[in-house]
Amino acid sequence: MRTLKELERELQPRQHLWYFEYYTGNNVGLFMKMNRVIYSGQSDIQRIDIFENPDLGVVFALDGITMTTEKDEFMYHEMLAHVPMFLHPNPKKVLIIGGGDGGTLREVLKHDSVEKAILCEVDGLVIEAARKYLKQTSCGFDDPRAEIVIANGAEYVRKFKNEFDVIIIDSTDPTAGQGGHLFTEEFYQACYDALKEDGVFSAETEDPFYDIGWFKLAYRRISKVFPITRVYLGFMTTYPSGMWSYTFASKGIDPIKDFDPEKVRKFNKELKYYNEEVHVASFALPNFVKKELGLM
């Protein structure tokens, strides 16, 4: 298969490449104009494409699935990171599995309490590409509190017991690369074991519209392991349906009853999406989502 760079070289004047992403079922999708192909490569695991769109800025895709765009990545990364970070009383040690673009790490490091944040990414080429081409999200890679580990996250987390305050799963789609390893009950159990007693957990769990099967499966498996499991939602404009799901879980901390909005109000770092009102509202689920999860 030819790379985007190779295809770009064959363009005639005033011609443009267009990026097509098909959602589950291949009947609906997203398309974006490519102003410029920045990088196109193939690792042992997946295809990596980075290109520029006139409205969205730099776009990062894995195996033909959009991971981030410069314009809207803050929505996803803030919701994935800050919900668990603000719920833990004093998060010092954090493990991020996946998230090789660096956006979740960037958000975690905004919390001054953090002493160490480990980013475990399975694909070293993603880290290299992010460091070079995704400056907006990879800005935390050289923070002295950050450690980058190239390893299979499902295997890496099993090395730890009672170790982390927060674990965040920033996985690729379960159908892309090795993302499916991060959706098993065995993996969630390993995360539970690696957390301290007051530890908290969050994971991206796909969209509840086109990917309802994976969404329900993730929720069911997480809830089998953690006594407290709650789904929350956020907007994500370039992800399927524009509605994205995350799942919070813990051994005892409740995401609403134990939430202190004053901590968020006093936070002195810039947040573009997450705030104390969004935190509470994100746990209010539409009826169709409740029904799919067996909550009504």
Swiss-Prot record:
Q: Catalyzes what?
A: S-adenosyl 3-(methylsulfanyl)propylamine + putrescine = S-methyl-5'-thioadenosine + spermidine + H(+)
Which top EC class applies here?
transferase
Query: Which positions fall inside the PABS domain?
Result: 16-251
Report the locations given in the UniProt record: Cytoplasm
Q: How does activity depend on temperature?
A: Optimum temperature is 90 degrees Celsius.
Protein name as catalogued: Polyamine aminopropyltransferase
Which positions in this protein are listed as binding S-methyl-5'-thioadenosine? 46, 121, 152-153
Q: How does activity depend on pH?
A: Optimum pH is 7.5.
Its source organism is Thermotoga maritima (strain ATCC 43589 / DSM 3109 / JCM 10099 / NBRC 100826 / MSB8)
Q: Where does spermidine bind?
A: 77, 101, 170-173
Report quaternary structure and partners. Answer: Homotetramer.
**Record GO terms (molecular function):** agmatine aminopropyltransferase activity; cadaverine aminopropyltransferase activity; spermidine synthase activity; sym-norspermidine synthase activity; thermospermine synthase activity
Q: Tell me the Gene3D superfamilies matching this sequence.
A: Spermidine synthase, tetramerisation domain, Vaccinia Virus protein VP39
What this protein is reported to do is described as:
Catalyzes the irreversible transfer of a propylamine group from the amino donor S-adenosylmethioninamine (decarboxy-AdoMet) to putrescine (1,4-diaminobutane) to yield spermidine. It has lower affinity and lower activity towards 1,3-diaminopropane, cadaverine (1,5-diaminopentane), agmatine, norspermidine and spermidine (in vitro).
